[in-house]
Amino acid sequence: MRGQSLPALSQSLLDGLRKHGMRERSPARISVDPLANAPADIELPTTNILSAPETILQIGSGAFLRGFVEDFVQLANIAGDPVGRVVSVQRKSDHRSAAFLRQDGLYTLILRGLENGKPVERKRIIASISRSLSADTEWSKVMAMAVRPSTRVIVSNVTESGLALGASDTPNDQPPLGFPGKLTQLLRERWQSSAGRDADIAVVPCELVENNGSMLSKLIDEQARAWNLSATFLDWLRSSVHFANTLVDRIVAGAPPPEKLEAEWQALGYRDDLIVCAEPFALFVLEADEFVHQHFPNGKASPGIRFVDDLTPYRVRKVQILNGSHTILGAIGRLLGLRTVRQAIDDRQLGKFVDSAICEEVIPATERGDESESAHYAREVLARFRNPFIEHSLVSICSNCSTKVGTRLFPAIRSFMKRRGVVPRRLLFGVAAVMLLLRESDVEDTHLELIREMWARVDDQSPDSTLAFVQQLLAKQVEWSREHIDLQAIAPEVATFLMKIREQGLRATMES
């Protein structure tokens, strides 16, 4: 049976799965029904979820949020800690929004990996999303959701590059282009509609930026002042909008590669155009006040959610070890012609290089003297990279890598230099690899056009020209990431790596 002939995931199909008693693992099946092909171990959402109120407005509808936040929301609702459902907002209507409509917001989450050295697989139909909206064409509906008293949480994942003011945004745009402008407008509407009474709301950003909630709060304040919004509104922002600093940790690969998608549908017994694959491991750390704790999933639903007084040690380990090594693996791996994280980490030379970068440069720079915990986490990370069940594309990891260099590598470089007094050569090789990737490969990056204009002015035979380019791009990466770095100390080493790679090749330079 081809995928096109399978029944599509929808509310009616979900009702049919319940009829077959799948949640109770009932053996009663009707063989002539196409649902008889569905496996009996799919975890179904409880019926109370489908009637739950919409309480969470989510800016972003990508695979990560669907494989992470929505999973925690469903677990909380099932566990009797109801937090409501999600209204998902994406920038414009496309094939994904059409699939959301066609599938009644439902999709399958497949978790595959190793736990205690043994393979595990879990399949869940996620019903956390009630509907999907387009910001470009349905902004009035997004605004209506923002002003509802029942809306208590706004979640976002616009990537690091999205946390920047839109230079041309105005308070009357429908909608503003930049995310801070969108959020400021939504919060202003909520404040105006309620006259500031009983309108408290939590903002839970999932971007991989240090103190992301605090940063977003400052951006909203800055945007409001730029728009000359009232002092009363600014006071309300400070008193009634509860920003959480967060750390998110789960490898979400997204949809299976096209050559494997048909087999997944056959195994499920139905067609799902929104299927998400991820690892079982999930950690969501929040540094937030009591309001966020009351209205967002907490540890009652899953041990993967932790509310803490200080998430710094979690963030340092995760961003510098997992995300930093991802950035290095992605850039070098793609330059070597590799396709997935597992291929990259299993490449003997590259795997050894990344392991050495973590153990000899990142962990020694770990603050607060928790090197043993960092070493344990690093071993877990490398094992997760080798997950045989996850096809984590290097292309997706490398998106917006020009900004990720600053947020993921600069802190470790800065800390290493402070503690050791020398530059971390492997991390700087990773910086050089990202620069080269942005010149030579097809990369989805907000700043790609500018960077390629900068590359076009480089004389490859001139060390001075290469150094000037490196200094210029590093300065831009400091600006984009808001992460300070000693440019004069690291630029010569990065430029030298670029020259050597051109003369000797990538592998020979990596070995030197």
Predicted ranges, named:
Residues 2-512:
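Substrate/ligand-engaging "lid" and interaction regions
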